[in-house]
Amino acid sequence: MAISRGDLVRVKRPESYWYNEIGKVASVDTSGIKYNCVVRFDKVNYAGISGTDGGANTNNFAESELEKA
């Protein structure tokens, strides 16, 4: 499948907040770790600090959990 930096991908991990959402690959680690793709999204998740509007907008995924959009 060969996902690389800058690709638009759709998340296929069912338990993820961003399931079926499209994000942009920020980096791909080739050292052999399981969740080697860092994906950045436009919207933030629900994990913001109390009293702020923010949350995380990146997450790590395995290549098998992503498909090119």
Curated annotation (Swiss-Prot):
InterPro entries noted in UniProt: Elect_transpt_acc-like_dom_sf, PSI_PsaE
Keyword Transmembrane: no
Subcellular location: Cellular thylakoid membrane
GO BP term, example: photosynthesis
Annotated keywords: Membrane, Photosynthesis, Photosystem I, Thylakoid
Bilayer disposition of the protein: Peripheral membrane protein
Pfam families referenced in this protein's UniProt entry, alphabetically: PSI_PsaE
Gene Ontology CC annotation, any one: plasma membrane-derived thylakoid membrane
Role description: Stabilizes the interaction between PsaC and the PSI core, assists the docking of the ferredoxin to PSI and interacts with ferredoxin-NADP oxidoreductase.
Family indicated by similarity: Belongs to the PsaE family.
Protein known as: Photosystem I reaction center subunit IV
Species in which this protein is naturally found: Prochlorococcus marinus (strain MIT 9301)
